[in-house]
């Protein structure tokens, strides 16, 4: 049985796509968005930064958004609601609630033990390890779909998950594989 008690995960970034279901006049929107940039010759949307919650939004005339930099799903919801309130002040009409779809969550974490990455790479299926190019094992989980970067220190980065539950499940699958191939050292009692 895999022991997850020492595993720590922290959200570093969430990316979401949002549909406001309304067309936007970006020339008007740029006037009400502080900390924003709009140069249609370079990019077809507004790049807007909120300080609270601390996120960046890409706003398109189709009413579609990309929100990035969030540390929680609640931050995304707060940012979208804040933008909607701002848009209402310039006459934007909303017929329905926005649709928010999480596209990617990135977690950093620590498994709480060290690993011989050469042994991991030789034993584990679905992984890549080229230490001359990158100092970690790249482990791909098929279901839930995620990619875990495993470093010799036991530190990990998990990306591609669409929920916190999926990230934990992906890490659980990695640990099961490590255990299955005898790559998890049992804690040995130190003798004094």
Swiss-Prot record:
Keyword field: DNA-binding, Repeat, Transcription, Transcription regulation
Alphabetical list of InterPro entries matching this protein: TBP (IPR000814), TBP_archaea (IPR033711), TBP_CS (IPR030491), TBP_dom_sf (IPR012295)
PROSITE patterns: TFIID
Similarity comment: Belongs to the TBP family.
Lineage: Archaea, Methanobacteriati, Methanobacteriota, Thermococci, Thermococcales
Gene Ontology MF terms: DNA binding; DNA-binding transcription factor activity
Record flagged with keyword Lipoprotein: no
Role summary: General factor that plays a role in the activation of archaeal genes transcribed by RNA polymerase. Binds specifically to the TATA box promoter element which lies close to the position of transcription initiation.
GO biological process, one term: DNA-templated transcription initiation
Keyword Transcription among record annotations: yes
Swiss-Prot/TrEMBL Sequence repeat ranges: 11-87, 102-178
Organism, as annotated: Thermococcus onnurineus (strain NA1)
Protein name: TATA-box-binding protein
